[in-house]
UniProtKB/Swiss-Prot annotation:
Keywords: Capsid protein, DNA-binding, Host endoplasmic reticulum, Host membrane, Host nucleus, Host-virus interaction, Ion channel, Ion transport, Late protein, Lipoprotein, Membrane, Myristate, Transmembrane, Transmembrane helix, Transport, Viral attachment to host cell, Viral ion channel, Viral penetration into host cytoplasm, Viral penetration into host nucleus, Viral penetration via permeabilization of host membrane, Viral release from host cell, Virion, Virus entry into host cell. One of its GO terms (biological process) is viral penetration into host nucleus. Residues 326-338 have a biased composition (Polar residues). The chain crosses the membrane at residues 290-310. Pfam families: Polyoma_coat2 (PF00761). One of its GO terms (molecular function) is structural molecule activity. The lineage of its organism: Viruses, Monodnaviria, Shotokuvirae, Cossaviricota, Papovaviricetes. Residues 273-308 are annotated as: D1. Belongs to the polyomaviruses capsid protein VP2 family. Residues 313-352 are annotated as: DNA-binding. This is Minor capsid protein VP2. It comes from the Viruses. Residues 313-352 are annotated as: Disordered.
């Protein structure tokens, strides 16, 4: 009924505009008298002056839109009357049906509700239920909702501006932070790589010598504990000393000699513990970056460009287990089972 009233309002407004433009009354346009008078005038002008219909309409001072409204108004009013009658009849039928079915009570089973009080009465449908049945329908509905067909220009501009503002507000800070993070990582890695290239490296054997000394010390230790060795020495009347010997210190005549001999014994020899690695510049004056071969895996790893050859050199070849065939595996299982069976029989015979 609301749609019919809307159409009636649009029809009245259109007919009123045509009446104001031509001078005819609304009743004459609705009855068709205005259309008949205009048709007679157009026919006479076209016959006398030899003009076409469109030229005749322009000659009498009408516009095509007003002529279309005046000529089509009687038919439109008749169709609207039929539509209004149909809508009125449908509304009456709906009213009768509402009155008839208002007293009818549809019972819902509540047996399961007592067992499960939190059970939902309606079926659960997810948000993308219709999009699963009809792919793309959600996007279409959102587009229709955001764009108004009557004012598509302002709504389109509003939607585009809101999307652009969301990009500026959400995406640009995230992309900026990611780019800053990547730039910082590249800068730190490049600085560390250049520091390692420019640093003077020295080959030091001190850790190796220290581990060798520990190995020699533990290899010379007796398997018997020192307390047991002292007990045996006291019982046998022997004198055993653990650690350093102080014979040269015991034979000193003065405290100064004891101090000098102790310092001489405890002082480590002044031995050079490493050799400097010589750095070579790029040949031919190219001023390119150079690095020793043993440093290449480290530098390439910092820049993230380790080749497969360097990976194989660093990690070693991949050792894959040999796959046994089905027959050999069954044979192995059979051999182990038979060995277990013989072992059981042998134990059984030994008990008997």
């Amino acid at each position: 009924m609301g749609a019919a009233l809307t159409l009636l309002g649009d029809l009245i407004a259109t007919v009123s505009e045509a009446a104001a433009a031509t001078g005819f009354s609304v009743a004459e346009i609705a009855a068709g008298e205005a259309a008949a008078a205009i048709e007679v005038q157009l026919a006479s002008v076209a016959t006398v002056e030899g003009l076409t219909t469109s030229e005749a309409i322009a000659a009498i001072g009408l516009i095509p839109q007003a002529y279309a409204v005046i000529s089509g108004a009687p038919a439109a009013i008749a169709g609207f009357a039929a539509l209004l009658q149909t809508v009125t009849g449908v509304s009456a039928v709906a009213q009768v049906g509402y009155r008839f079915f208002s007293d009818w009570d549809h019972k819902v089973s509540t047996v399961g509700l007592y067992q499960q009080p939190g059970m939902a009465v309606d079926l659960y449908r997810p948000d993308d239920y219709y999009d699963i049945l009809f792919p793309g329908v959600q996007t279409f509905v959102h587009s229709v909702q955001y764009l108004d067909p009557r004012h598509w220009g302002p709504t389109l501009f509003n939607a585009i501006s809101q999307a652009f503002w969301r990009v500026i507000q959400n995406d640009i800070p995230r992309l900026t932070s990611q780019e800053l993070e990547r730039r910082t990582q590249r800068y730190l890695r490049d600085s560390l790589a250049r520091f390692l290239e420019e640093t003077t490296w020295t080959v030091i054997n001190a850790p190796v010598n220290w581990y060798n000394s520990l190995q020699d010390y533990y290899s010379t230790l007796s398997p018997i504990r020192p307390t047991m060795v002292r007990q045996v020495a006291n019982r046998e009347g022997l004198q055993i000393s653990f650690g350093h010997t102080y014979d040269n210190i015991d034979e000193a005549d003065s405290i100064q000699q004891v101090t000098e001999r102790w310092e001489a014994q405890s002082q480590s020899p002044n031995v050079q513990s490493g050799e400097f690695i010589e750095k070579f510049e790029a040949p031919g004056g190219a001023n390119q970056r150079t690095a020793p071969q043993w440093m290449l895996p480290l530098l390439l790893g910092l820049y993230g460009s380790v080749t497969s050859a360097l990976k194989a050199y660093e990690d070693g070849p991949n050792k894959k287990k040999r796959k046994l065939s089905r027959g050999s595996s069954q044979k192995t299982k059979g051999t182990s089972a038979s060995a277990k069976a013989r072992h059981k029989r042998r134990n059984r015979s030994s008990r008997s």
